[in-house]
Amino acid sequence: MGCTVSQEDKAAADRSKMIDKNLREDGEKAAREVKLLLLGAGESGKSTIVKQMKIIHEDGYSEDECKQYRAVVYSNTVQSIMAIIKAMTILHLDYERPEREEDAKRLFKMAAEAEERGDLPEELANIIKDLWADSGIQHCLTRAREYQLNDSAAYYLKDLERISKPDYIPTQQDVLRTRVKTTGIVETHFTFKDLHFKMFDVGGQRSERKKWIHCFEGVTAIIFCVAMSAYDLVLAEDEEMNRMHESMKLFDSICNNKWFTETSIILFLNKKDLFEQKIAHSPLTICFPEYEGPNTYQEAQAYIQTKFEDLNKKKETKEIYTHFTCATDTKNVQFVFDAVTDVIIKNNLKDCGLF
C-alpha cells in the first residue's frame, strides 16, 4: 500500500515537473516570438523595409524572383516619365527642343501596350532617353514637389541604358526601389538573434486603414515609418493635406491608442537621404511655419524628431525609440534593425519575467 502511494506521489511529482517544464518552455517560446506591425502613411517606406528583411535575413531575391520584377521596373520607369510630361503641361514649362512634344505624344501612344506586355521595346526606350536628356524635363524634375512623382523616378531614368538592355535582370537595389501600392496585409517571417519574427506590412493609404484593426492584438512592437522628405508634399489621396501633418496625425492616434499601452513604439524617420538633399532648397517652414532654426540637415531633422516625440502623452511610462533611416540602404537598415532587435529582446524577456 505504502509502495503504491509513493509511486503515485512520484508520478504526480513527475507530472508536476513536466507541467512546469512545459510552462517554462512555452514562456521562453513566447518570448522568442515577435509580432511586428509596420505602420505609417502611404509611401513612407514600409514595403522597402520588408524587402530589406528578405535581403538581410533570407538570402535576398533569387535570379528568378528578380526577373519577375522586370515588368514592375519598366512600369515604374514609364509611369515616372509620363508624370513628368504631364507636369510640363500643368506647370506651363517648355521643352528645350520642340520635337520632344512629338516624342511625348508617341510615348503616351506606346506606353499602355508596353505595360500590358510587361516589356520595354527599343523604340520606347529611345524616346524616353531623348526626353530625359531634355533640359526642360530636367527643370520640371527640380519642381517635383508640385506634382506626384515616385521617389525612384530619377534612379531608374538615369540608368535607362542598363535597364533597356534585352538581357536586363533587375539587381537587389532595383527591386528595393520598385513601387507597388500595398493593398491589404503582407506578412513576412524570418529568424534573427534566435527570435522568430512575423512582420506585417499594412497598406498606408487612407482607404486601407480600416483593414489594420485585426492585426493589433498581441503585437510586440510597432515600427512607425515617416517619410521625412515628404514635409513639402501633399497626399496623393487628398491634395489639401500636407504629408508630414498626415503622418503626425496618424502617429498621434497610434502612439496614444489604448491598444498599445504595453507595445514598444519604434519610430523610423525615413528617407533621410532625400530629406538631406531637399532641405537645402525647400524650407521646413512649408510644413512648420513656426520653425525658426536654420535649414540644415541636423537642425531640421532634430526639430522633426521633437515634433513626433512630443505627441507621446505618456512620456513617464512610454518611451519612443527613434531612428533615422534610409530604407533603400541595406547597411543602414541592418544596423538599425540590430538595435531595434536588442530593445525587443530586452522588453520581451522583461514581459515574460525572464529578465
UniProtKB/Swiss-Prot annotation:
Lipid sites, type S-palmitoyl cysteine: C3
One Pfam family, short name: G-alpha
Subcellular location: Cytoplasm; Cytoplasm, Cytoskeleton, Microtubule organizing center, Centrosome; Cell membrane
Sequence positions that bind Mg(2+): S47, T182
Any one annotated GO CC term: midbody
G-alpha domain segment(s): 32-355
Region described as G4 motif: spans on this chain: 266-273
Binding site for GTP: 40-47, 176-182, 201-205, 270-273, 327
Lipid addition sites, N-myristoyl glycine: G2
Region G5 motif: start-end pairs: 325-330
UniProt function note: Guanine nucleotide-binding proteins (G proteins) are involved as modulators or transducers in various transmembrane signaling systems. The G(i) proteins are involved in hormonal regulation of adenylate cyclase: they inhibit the cyclase in response to beta-adrenergic stimuli. May play a role in cell division.
Similarity comment: family membership: Belongs to the G-alpha family. G(i/o/t/z) subfamily.
Protein's name according to its UniProt entry: Guanine nucleotide-binding protein G(i) subunit alpha-2
Organism: Oryzias latipes
Gene coding for it: gnai2
